[in-house]
């Protein structure tokens, strides 16, 4: 005879009041990841094109980055966030559309900084594709 199933009680995520934060947009050639943190660096909300249901080459589109940024902004606004500082990293196509989506969601953007790592002649790059 089966024992009665126990219900797992999950604690609700507490809503912190964080008025301003930092938005990190990482735009690679294959995906776009948006992370919103508090000024210290603790993650408040995150989203990516892949987590929003886009697969394969559709993850790298500007539209996928826009949808991911809107979702991330909605989660952060639930914590009372109103203004962000934006750090953009990477060469991907979702850079501008993710930034525009954050502004359209109602965030006041204090400043935008490009933090793409540029090698001072470091590792050898991968060879060119021949299609």
From Swiss-Prot:
The keyword Ribonucleoprotein applies. One of its GO terms (molecular function) is structural constituent of ribosome. It comes from the Bacteria. GO terms for biological process: translation. One of its GO terms (cellular component) is cytosolic small ribosomal subunit. SUPFAM superfamilies: Translational machinery components. The keyword rRNA-binding applies. Pfam families: Ribosomal_S11. InterPro entries: Ribosomal_uS11, Ribosomal_uS11_bac-type, Ribosomal_uS11_CS, Ribosomal_uS11_sf. PANTHER family: 40S RIBOSOMAL PROTEIN S14/30S RIBOSOMAL PROTEIN S11 (PTHR11759). HAMAP family: Ribosomal_uS11. Belongs to the universal ribosomal protein uS11 family. Part of the 30S ribosomal subunit. Interacts with proteins S7 and S18. Binds to IF-3. Located on the platform of the 30S subunit, it bridges several disparate RNA helices of the 16S rRNA. Forms part of the Shine-Dalgarno cleft in the 70S ribosome. This is Small ribosomal subunit protein uS11. It comes from Geobacter sulfurreducens (strain ATCC 51573 / DSM 12127 / PCA). The lineage of its organism: Bacteria, Pseudomonadati, Thermodesulfobacteriota, Desulfuromonadia, Geobacterales.
């Amino acid at each position: 005879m089966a024992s009665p199933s126990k219900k797992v009680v999950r604690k609700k995520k507490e809503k912190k009041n964080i008025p301003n934060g930092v938005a990190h947009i990482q735009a690679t050639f294959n995906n776009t990841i948006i992370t919103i943190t508090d000024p210290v660096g603790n993650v408040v909300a995150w989203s990516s094109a892949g987590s929003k249901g886009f697969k394969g080459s559709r993850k790298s589109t500007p539209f996928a980055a826009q949808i991911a940024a809107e979702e991330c902004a909605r989660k952060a606004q639930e914590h009372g966030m109103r203004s962000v500082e934006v750090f953009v990293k990477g060469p991907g196509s979702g850079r501008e559309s993710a930034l525009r989506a954050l502004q359209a969601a109602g965030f006041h953007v204090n400043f935008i900084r490009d933090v793409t790592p540029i090698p001072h002649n470091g590792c050898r790059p991968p060879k060119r594709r021949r299609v």
